[in-house]
Regions:
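Hydrophobic transmembrane alpha-helical segments in integral membrane proteins
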Residues: 1-20, 62-74, 204-206
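Early transmembrane hairpin module of multi-pass membrane proteins
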Residues: 9, 37-81, 88-91, 95
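Hydrophobic cores of alpha-helical transmembrane segments in multi-pass inner/ER membrane proteins
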Residues: 13-22, 73-88, 139-148, 207-225
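Juxtamembrane "helix-exit" motif on the non-cytosolic side of transmembrane helices
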Residues: 26-30, 52-62, 90, 116-125
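Membrane-interfacial loop-to-transmembrane alpha-helix junctions, especially the N-terminal start
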Residues: 31-44, 97-104, 158-162
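Membrane-proximal helix-loop-helix units in multi-pass membrane proteins
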Residues: 87-158
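Hydrophobic alpha-helical membrane-insertion segments
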Residues: 162-179
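Short, membrane-exposed interhelical loops at transmembrane-helix boundaries
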Residues: 186-207
Length: 241
């Protein structure tokens, strides 16, 4: 098995920590109680710490959860987040209070997808994963501040554009997860058989699929909830007039 380039380890960790801090600041600004902001921060820290502790030595490629590889654990934070959004009134209010331009703008962190193309150029990642996932993330990351600015200035059709952008960004991540499963050395590998995706679920690259990707998916869901709710209220208001 080839070795992961050491020069990318520090940037991967720092980028992920920066994303965590920015997301926490966004939630802390929306929280009406300090205790709620602290709980959100603690949850993010525990999540990141778990990935950092478990990702070395190929833990997420093992089959102790057979027939589902340990990489199936990436769905746990998403399930927890969606469950809170569906059942917790306090969390629903927190999400509704988040400033949308910030929630969308923070997805500039998706530029981390450039690492996939860099690894492909070095022959360390299969094209079947690197191209669609890397290019998709870069496009979403570049357009994130643009969509955030359009929302900030409340330009015409800004909400529709933001909804469409969120859907595209969400679909890109879902496709990346599927391709990650299909190209990694697990029982579900059907692509890149001659060049398996060894690094994707190992340290430090595991920070992307096991922290950044699920967190970004949740941010898309939170944003869509608020934007669709606002669109529904606007339609009702226009109908009453």
């Amino acid at each position: 098995m080839p070795e992961f380039p050491e020069e990318f380890i520090a940037p991967m960790i720092s980028s992920t920590v920066t994303m965590l801090i920015l997301v926490w600041l966004i939630f802390a600004r929306a929280a009406q109680r300090l205790s709620l902001a602290l709980w959100v921060g603690l949850a993010l820290l525990v999540w990141l710490a778990a990935v950092l502790l478990l990702s070395p030595h190929g833990f997420f490629l093992k089959l102790s959860l057979h027939p589902i590889p340990n990489i199936g654990l990436l769905f746990v934070p998403m399930i927890i987040g969606i469950n809170f959004l569906a059942k917790s009134v306090v969390f629903q209010k927190l999400v509704d209070n988040i400033y949308q331009p910030w929630l969308i703008g923070v997805q500039i962190s998706r530029m981390m997808g450039m690492i996939f193309l860099t690894l492909y150029a070095r022959g360390l990642m299969p094209a079947e994963f690197a191209f669609p996932s890397g290019i998709g993330d870069i496009v979403v990351g570049i357009t994130a501040p643009v969509i955030a600015a359009i929302l900030f200035f409340n330009l015409p059709f800004s909400r529709i554009l933001a909804i469409g952008w969120n859907i595209i960004g969400f679909a890109d991540l879902v496709a990346a997860i599927i391709l990650g499963f299909l190209t990694s050395p697990t029982p579900y590998q059907f692509l890149a058989l001659d060049n398996p995706n060894y690094f994707l679920f190992d340290f430090p690259l595991a920070l992307v699929p096991l922290f950044a990707v699920p967190l970004s998916l949740l941010l898309h869901i939170f944003s869509l909830r608020v934007l669709l709710k606002q669109a529904s209220i606007s339609r009702d208001y226009l109908t009453q007039e």
